From Swiss-Prot:
The keyword Isomerase applies. GO terms for cellular component: cytosol. It catalyses: uridine(13) in tRNA = pseudouridine(13) in tRNA. GO terms for molecular function: RNA binding; tRNA pseudouridine(13) synthase activity. The keyword Transport does not apply. One of its GO terms (biological process) is tRNA pseudouridine synthesis. InterPro entries: PsdUridine_synth_cat_dom_sf, PsdUridine_synth_TruD, PsdUridine_synth_TruD_CS, PsdUridine_synth_TruD_insert, TruD_catalytic, TruD_insert_sf, TruD_pseudoU_synthase. It comes from Legionella pneumophila (strain Lens). Responsible for synthesis of pseudouridine from uracil-13 in transfer RNAs. The gene is truD. This is tRNA pseudouridine synthase D.
Amino acid sequence: MYSLNWPRAYGIPNSTATFKLCPEDFQVNELFEGQFSGEGEHIVLKIEKKGLTTEQVIKSLARLINKPIKLISYAGLKDKQALTTQWLSIHAPGEVIEGIETLEAPGWKILECTRHNKKLRPGFLSGNHFTITLRNVSDESDLIHRIEQIKFKGVPNYFGEQRFGRDGGNLIKAEEILVQGRKVKDRFLKGMYFSAARSWLYNLILSRRVKESSWNLPLLGDVIQLVGSNSIFVNDKSLDEQLLQRIGEKDVSPASPLPGRSKNLVKGTALQIINEVYAEWSAWLDGLEKNGLEEAWRANILYAEQIEYRINQGTVELSFVLPAGAYATVVLRELVQY
């Protein structure tokens, strides 16, 4: 029921490659704008982890410092099968936790420690820097061509398959809550299932636009989003040369909805596509609205910035920066089959 094989913008890559042979093949580092204050109620830790989920690290840390998990916050979840650095915050007003700077456990260790006047939360990140190793690359020239292509044109901004849980398990749970009325007390899990449902519907709309080669074009009635911002406006023209130029300059992008209570912004051709996709999912839409979710917008185009690559005898090391909330795997799937 939940096929995650979304259509590609540039067709199926000629090249195959091996990915994630070991955690070091997928390295992620969080990026922030600005600096931590160095003072305040929250201890802020830079943690390196390998082979663990963010939740597993938080539980381990909580046990070691004898704190409830609810006092520990994060800005973003990081993959298990990866070598990642990320920041966590602990609400500890006026408290010194002895030895925390050198704390470590199997699979993770603390690299830096400071304080801040605010707790970390989703939305705090400006982005993530990825370093990815692809092994046994079968067609280096096709890979290089595709890298150069996405530098300028970007890729469809799908949510990655990890958003939906193993074998789409988060979507199954979402169906149980939204359609069958199942109760889930855990707010974190409930939020995760709702996020998966909204992401699924967003991906369906974006995949339709990719199939029709309109994912990166401004349709009549489209919501347009400023790149790197939540600011939006509605395109009221069928073909706007100035808007096309701004898209080419990476200034704006057509956007698709994350469903919830609608403000009825989208119009015309864009609305027709959305309504056709939504027609099969009315129970989900009703459930999301009843649970208080508000409609939001996500850019159709994802730009990978600061792209660099090195090739050595069939092994390619690729690095780039993505904005917070974007998935490296949706970039990779446009480059190679893995």
